[in-house]
């Protein structure tokens, strides 16, 4: 097994959309190589993780198939240090593949609090662009290299092989130990992560607040990390719920500030519901009753007046305001109650 570390000064996008959700998080950019698509019969052979905060690219390579367990364990130790990872189709492939191989190879239960698997939060750029942008209509397909070309990134990619060719090269490398084959395999994996790091700028081509409301978004407060999977008006309440990913707490309460509320934090799940006022087609949350104070900066929104925040106007959901309020409610809970 080889663990290769390379210094790299690139950053993810600095756009306001990105910083809204990820500014205070330790983010990694991740890609893996395997011998095939089915984790029941194929193996993890290589993983690359760019630790954005440290400015380091990590690659963990199984030099032989029988080193898979050691390589995967080493790579997961790196990824579990992240608050969030960026992938491309990782919710459908990279993350489930590693989870299934881990269960089979390492035969261990995930630590208490690592709800749902080995990676705390996964931003899948493919899902964002596929469902919440116009690129599906503009481009012939949404393969990573196709989107890279659209974003003007073709000149920054050095490798010229496909994922399938990478597997064929690995078979040759395992038999011969060819240095040339190893370099090509590592370059392909390394370039995928470098390009995906640059591709985070594509969030500006999407309806990102709506995407995050649908796909879920991370919330970090102190040593606690959560994923808000659902947020918005539900009946006569404003509802936010999801998973506790790190340092879970157990709590049941029925008041937030001076407002009636239902708050449940149990094992790896959480839920907060507060009153939703309805007036002339508007869905409104009384911020003063919740005693949010300076915890959030919700007063900056045009539809926030005199302590009342509009989260729905007719049939239109205000996704940015909804997500911001959900983040604020979670932070207020940990500040006042936990």
Regions found by a protein language model. Give the residues of each.
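DEDD superfamily 3′-5′ metal-dependent exonuclease/proofreading module
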Residues: 1-42, 51-338
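Short beta-strand scaffold segments in enzyme catalytic cores
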Residues: 47-49
